[in-house]
Amino acid sequence: QNFPQLEKFYFNYNVATHDDDDFIFYDCVCDQFISSFWIERQWFVEVAYTRATISIIIKPYRQKWYEFINIDNDDFNVYHSTLLTIRYKPIDEYRQTLLDEIEWILDVATIYHLEISEEDFFIGAIIEIMNLLPDLDSLKLSSITLPTTTLLSIEEREEINFIVYNNEITKVYLEKMNKFDDVLFLIDLFPELKYLQIGCTSDIDINLFLQIILMKINNKTDFNLHLLAISIPTADDSMMKRMQNIIDSKSLLFNYTIKRTYDTIFLRMK
């Protein structure tokens, strides 16, 4: 209203977290930041958690990783753009505090995208966070630590099963795969998955990895994966050709396209 020609706007509102169990943002007015006023102006809202602060960040809208590849041929819905970023890994005794703070944010905002930038984040903690965010469409993880299945309690297994049957996440990006089981677990956890991007190290046996992943996908009924992206520093046209040869020789896919963009090879399944 006062700046009708304003095109770019950056704003960062920080609130220090408290140590008490009854954490409340006494002075925060986040409902003013997470509103249609900003969305209608194509300004992007991000809620970021660090160990000491929670930030409400407003900045010009820019494409995120989940928007560069249009799977459904739909226009991006800016009203579904609110992002929650977690930039620290709470120890077990403070995990509930993080969950309580996320619940507070949900009183004023619906979160559609979640990014966790800390490495080796325990998947059990991720599932607890996801339980609070039923509207999630995308999930970006730095790297994960899996549970030992034999040591899971009945309650933990029930929680995993609940997420499998109730989440609607369609896009997942794992920046660093520690072992093949990381990807296999994510495929099982997200039955609505349409786009999966995996970051691999240069020493990976790409042929073995590709066979294991595609066999896993082929063995799942009603699985909707349309696009598999494999990011690897040594990716080149020769690697892409080897991948194509292994797919064809093993009959892993019949109707697909393969292409490379810089260090990422994209397998689109039709």
Segments from the language model and where they lie:
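Eukaryote-biased activation of long, low-complexity terminal tails and linkers
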Residues: Q1-K270
